[in-house]
Amino acid sequence: MKKSLQIALDGPAGAGKSTIAKSLAKQLGYVYIDTGAIYRAVTYRALNEGIALEDGPALAQMIENMSLRLVPSEEGQRVFDGEEEVTSVIRSSEVTNNVSFVARQPEVRDALMDLQRDLAKKGGVVMDGRDIGTHVLPNADLKVFMTASVEERARRRHEENVSKGIPSDYEQLIEEIALRDKRDSEREVAPLRQAEDAHFLDTTTLSIDGVVQAIERLIEEVKA
């Protein structure tokens, strides 16, 4: 077993994947790869350029002209499209509410698949998303499917928004997350689902430290 593992964290919106992935990567000395940020950057660019979010071929053409970079930082990672940093703007409610439309286009997923795999090929990575264990890294050394109740995920997202000064409505977030769950699980291309060999982890009642410790135990089992 190689020492530098590929660790895949999947799950629905607001399950805490990014928070846990950042913490794990920092403790392990691994690189954190937020694939959701990649799709958000594409969505942000499409919205700015007025490209129809369900026009897969047009989106794929747009991606060819993008220069996406993920740069490690103390907060996890910074996202750049060419020379423009889009780390903060891709977290807007407009992008959040539209990224599912972009992500379900097969041409988009194909265009971004090689980029994601290339980032992870050397191992020593923690990658989070919706279909990492099922499609992007089907041979990952450790796969964890994280989830939590819709209410808890909305509470977490609300607190995150407030801490960042982003306008937020808890009840509206519940509706938006439930709708996004439906879209993500029903899309034809790479739907949200647990990989057969993934470990299921309900984080509803767990603290960040509790989740990290649970996954660290799984890592030790893989390395044993």
UniProtKB/Swiss-Prot annotation:
Biological processes per GO annotation: nucleobase-containing small molecule interconversion; pyrimidine nucleotide metabolic process
Instruction: State whether keyword Coiled coil applies.
Output: no
Q: Which residues bind ATP?
A: G11, P12, A13, G14, A15, G16, K17, S18, T19
State the superkingdom. Bacteria
Q: What is its EC number?
A: 2.7.4.25
Q: What subcellular compartments does it reside in?
A: Cytoplasm
What are the entry keywords? ATP-binding, Cytoplasm, Kinase, Nucleotide-binding, Transferase
Look at the named UniProt entry and state the broad enzyme category this protein falls under. Answer: transferase
Reaction(s) catalysed by this chain's protein: CMP + ATP = CDP + ADP; dCMP + ATP = dCDP + ADP
* Alphabetized InterPro entries for the sequence: Cytidylate_kin, Cytidylate_kinase_dom, P-loop_NTPase
* Short name of any one Pfam family annotated for the protein: Cytidylate_kin
Q: Which GO terms describe its molecular function?
A: ATP binding; CMP kinase activity; dCMP kinase activity
> How is this protein annotated for GO cellular component?
cytosol
Family stated for the protein in its record: Belongs to the cytidylate kinase family. Type 1 subfamily.
PANTHER family per the record? Answer: CYTIDYLATE KINASE, CYTIDYLATE KINASE/PANTOATE-BETA-ALANINE LIGASE
Q: What is this protein called?
A: Cytidylate kinase
Organism of this sequence: Exiguobacterium sp. (strain ATCC BAA-1283 / AT1b)
| Phylogenetic classification of the source organism | Bacteria, Bacillati, Bacillota, Bacilli, Bacillales
